[in-house]
Amino acid sequence: MNGTVNSEDLKGKVVLINIFATWCGPCQSELAEVQKTLWPKYKDNKDFCMLVIGREHTDNQLTEYNKRKGFTFPLYPDPKREVTGKFASQYIPRSYLIDKDGKVISATVGYKKEEMDKLMKEIDKALK
């Protein structure tokens, strides 16, 4: 949906990677909360990047999905599980928060609404 991502583009940034599937109920709940609370807060921060990756989905599938859901953040396809096969081979949703030095500072599996506040506090801390 938004091209490719180069690791050079992510250097020095706080990066949130979220792996989801359109058929996954908890993923739908999590992405709705991301759209409502997280994305509006961080979308304009030049030191933050969010990669929402659709496991086993094509660009066309994600475009159609986004039309139905109305998300304003980019969705990235991974139809052959080249990325998601390494980081979320089984359970989703899965999220990784990476600090400006490229270190994973948080990793979660599944979704609970109360975890969103914790994640946002971790993002705030990493952005300082």
Q: Which residue ranges define each predicted feature?
A:
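A short beta-strand-turn-helix
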Residues: 1-15
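Conserved Rossmann-like nucleotide-binding pocket used by diverse enzymes
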Residues: 6, 20, 51
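Conserved helix-turn-beta segment immediately C-terminal to the redox Cys motif
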Residues: 13-14, 29-53, 67
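Short pre-active-site segment immediately N-terminal to redox-active cysteine/selenocysteine motifs
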Residues: 13-15, 20-23, 91
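Solvent-exposed loop/turn segments at secondary-structure junctions
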Residues: 21-26, 56-60, 81-83
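Thiol-based oxidoreductase modules, predominantly thioredoxin-like and allied folds used
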Residues: 46-59, 71-80
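Thiol/disulfide oxidoreductase modules built on the thioredoxin-like
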Residues: 64-71, 78-124
